[in-house]
Swiss-Prot record:
Phenotype of gene-disrupted mutants: Defects in both embryo and seedling development, and pale yellow seeds. Die as embryos, probably because of intolerance to desiccation and abnormal protein and lipid body accumulation in mature seeds, but immature mutant seeds can be germinated in culture and lead to short life seedlings defective in shoot and root development, with reduced hypocotyls elongation in the dark. Seedlings accumulate less anthocyanin, are intolerant to desiccation, form trichomes on cotyledons, and have reduced accumulation of storage proteins and lipids.
Annotated effect of mutating residue 213 to E: In alt2-2; severely sensitive to DNA cross-linking agents, enhanced tolerance to aluminum (Al), but impaired halting root growth in response to Al toxicity
Comment field (misc): 'Tanmei' means short life in Japanese.
Record key words, sorted: Cell cycle, Cytoplasm, Developmental protein, DNA damage, Nucleus, Repeat, WD repeat
WD repeat residue intervals: 15-54, 62-100, 157-197, 213-256, 260-299, 306-347, 348-386
A GO CC term assigned to this protein in UniProt: cytoplasm
Localization in the cell: Cytoplasm; Nucleus
Protein name: Protein DECREASED SIZE EXCLUSION LIMIT 1
Amino acid sequence: MSKRPPPDPVAVLRGHRHSVMDVSFHPSKSLLFTGSADGELRIWDTIQHRAVSSAWAHSRANGVLAVAASPWLGEDKIISQGRDGTVKCWDIEDGGLSRDPLLILETCAYHFCKFSLVKKPKNSLQEAESHSRGCDEQDGGDTCNVQIADDSERSEEDSGLLQDKDHAEGTTFVAVVGEQPTEVEIWDLNTGDKIIQLPQSSPDESPNASTKGRGMCMAVQLFCPPESQGFLHVLAGYEDGSILLWDIRNAKIPLTSVKFHSEPVLSLSVASSCDGGISGGADDKIVMYNLNHSTGSCTIRKEITLERPGVSGTSIRVDGKIAATAGWDHRIRVYNYRKGNALAILKYHRATCNAVSYSPDCELMASASEDATVALWKLYPPHKSL
């Protein structure tokens, strides 16, 4: 019996005039956010499959590099990143963007690395929704509070203020590549302040050996594993193919350094459980890895060799069952995340695929491409076993 052909998208969203760089679903509403290389940010209705809003979020010369929505950010906010050195936080008003951004982070970063909103562990969609209602509890007694570990040079007073503030409200952090392309910076989206940089060094110190010779940081993931007592962790992928795992309680030295790729790491995704993830790069490898926070290790769980090199984007569904990659060969590849086996190769797009993302209810997947389209897919419903 022959294999069934891969499905077609349930809808194709057209309207962007240039390459669609990133895509993100609203945490609870039937809305999709997309950003393109000419600076346009569009909001789409995923039920009626039409655009409900369009705005020029960043300059046309620099474009939108990334967009993100999150239950931790709030129901009425999204953030965008441009190659103009800024990250902007927007209010969603009647389905459209606020005329002016609520907050602008002047990161002075003009690179290709997409930002990462902090990912906090959740075992169910209800936990994410409870955050917007002010709930501080998660299963197992963990809290949504994210604490900042200050280095020895930060005063005790500043440290106390940070921790008190974080306990009082659900602070949301974002990680970006810094003005120095080997460094990762963490910013507070409530205050607009830069909190810390990795690796941490004083002005009179020489370049940190942990990132020396690795080239630019090309991919980053910011997350808060349940074992960390609320302290942030960062995965950073570099130009030489290496991946560094950081615990900000020790901002000078990474917990571990591994080299899963032979070419630049272009995308990192951490599962909602924060105990592993998937990476892709400019080589012909897709790597699924485990994170052990008690030992500070990152180890390969599954390595997949591609016929054609190049992975621009990766995503793991919230339920941890499915993962997908966006390829240079115009293909979206879908995998069983738990077992590591291939499930489908989707061939709709006619140019490089830049990003892929799953809806919070696990029903939809969206793919973005240089062909200026966004495709919506319904694959492997969450209530069915694989």
